[in-house]
């Protein structure tokens, strides 16, 4: 086959990797919905979902069928175009972010020199989905939830970006693979512990997970910016939240825990194990912590996270300058 050149083979393999990684991300998010309910039941001393299939393992199938057969209703007072576009933007921006995460030395869709900046670009686009959903719904609770979510996301993205500048300075690159390679001897969680803590807090806030789920506070805003959504559109927002959990967990593994590096086990196993630990931590937070007031969340970000990231960046820069070779 004369047309099957090395360039075509490389493109085909990249497309194959993209499909596998995206399906794995969505599948992991769907599985996480059931795992979370089972773990919450265990930690809260009650039964989780245990009626569909043996030990409730088919609960995911039941939930998917329920969402598919729900009426996909659009309110007559909604802005139809933006209302339909919002969940698509939310899901697409999250899935595209997986393109720059290296799973193993040989697996990863796009080896971009600005991989970290690409992630922040996708995170910024995700804010538009929230704003479109709240504004187009024509509902005051949806609009209030969208305003909360956009302000919280934009604020904590600032701290998230600053917390990673120390990692970028130590690795000397925005390329995800080069950042992982720089952690072969020492994971960045050790020299960048304060940056890791800030990134963890910011990641929880950006994904709107408990205890930072003020944009969706059921007691105050009746489910926030997706109150008017139903059927598959609501399902895209719902699954998107869990895709965000997997994404932030994978990023923390890549940037602070050495990615696929580890002894004895294959690289893919190390990456999945580390990611699973952070996913479990996300779930544990929901069971363990109460929801603070919205003003307390914003104050914590600007009064604690921002100074901490700036101090971490200043100290990191000073240490690199002091210990760098002369003339380097």
Curated annotation (Swiss-Prot):
Main location: membrane
Mode of membrane association: Multi-pass membrane protein
Catalyzed reactions per annotation: a quinone + NADH + 5 H(+)(in) = a quinol + NAD(+) + 4 H(+)(out)
Residue stretches spanning the membrane: 8-28, 81-101, 114-134, 154-174, 186-206, 237-257, 265-285, 304-324
Location of this chain's protein in the cell: Cell inner membrane
Pfam families: NADHdh (PF00146)
Domain of life: Bacteria
Gene name of this polypeptide: nuoH
NCBIfam families: PRK06076.1-1 (NF004740), PRK06076.1-2 (NF004741)
Swiss-Prot/TrEMBL GO biological process terms: aerobic respiration
Molecular function GO labels: NADH dehydrogenase activity; oxidoreductase activity, acting on NAD(P)H, quinone or similar compound as acceptor; quinone binding
Enzyme class: translocase
Similarity comment: family membership: Belongs to the complex I subunit 1 family.
Quaternary structure (record): NDH-1 is composed of 14 different subunits. Subunits NuoA, H, J, K, L, M, N constitute the membrane sector of the complex.
Annotated EC: 7.1.1.-
Protein name per Swiss-Prot or TrEMBL: NADH-quinone oxidoreductase subunit H
Function description: NDH-1 shuttles electrons from NADH, via FMN and iron-sulfur (Fe-S) centers, to quinones in the respiratory chain. The immediate electron acceptor for the enzyme in this species is believed to be ubiquinone. Couples the redox reaction to proton translocation (for every two electrons transferred, four hydrogen ions are translocated across the cytoplasmic membrane), and thus conserves the redox energy in a proton gradient. This subunit may bind ubiquinone.
Keyword vocabulary terms for this entry: Cell inner membrane, Cell membrane, Membrane, NAD, Quinone, Translocase, Transmembrane, Transmembrane helix, Ubiquinone
This protein's GO CC annotations: plasma membrane
